[in-house]
Amino acid sequence: MKKFLITILALCCAACNSDWRKQYDEVAPTRTENMMVRKGDKYGLVSPKGLEITPVKYDYIDTNPPQDMPFYDVTINNLRGIIKPSGEEIIPAKYDFIWYSQGVFVVKLNDSYQLLDSHNKSLTPWFDEIDVFYQGLAFAKNTGYYGFLNPKGELVLPFVYDDADHFNESGYAMVKYKGKWGMIDKKGNTKLPFEYEHAEPYSEPTEEWEDYYYMLIKNGKELTIDKEGNFL
């Protein structure tokens, strides 16, 4: 009799484990053992046994992010947040946009930008602009001028530039200072003097974007340099 009851309970549990899917309009796999579910037009995450590990409240969950992004982008009412694949909320869905870059998040709200860490801690005040990180630095704009931040939110190069491009893989960036463009290294040392009216990166159609050059204009004349600042 005891064995019979155990068998009945086991069958009931198996039925319960499979029946949980019926309450959802869609059940989809993710990169982990957890699954994404949809009820109406709302999404959430559940465990393999059907236990909800997030509320089914999101308008969108990106369960297939880029390989370097170990989190899920979520959306509620066109505002974005971040959750872990385990369902834990990292950043509430209250930002206009979120970028993940070198272990931290660039968030945008009402045309202002801020850096947050993976614990939703503010690393910077609000700025007019923050780019994603290239070669360990990101340009930021504050009160009309550009400088460069590291992923800790520290200001590495001061807000003195009129305009800025990101650092290339050779460790140089084109920046505009007192109305003219030049090239600097990561310490702010001048690689190319500030004497050009225009600077624009480009690549040949047959080359990868990483293999780009800069087109410069000085006194109306076009010049070309490579990523190290050498004239071609």
Task: Describe the residue ranges of each PLM region.
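Sec-dependent N-terminal signal peptides
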Residues: 4-12
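Residue-level detector of conserved, function-critical positions
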Residues: 16-232
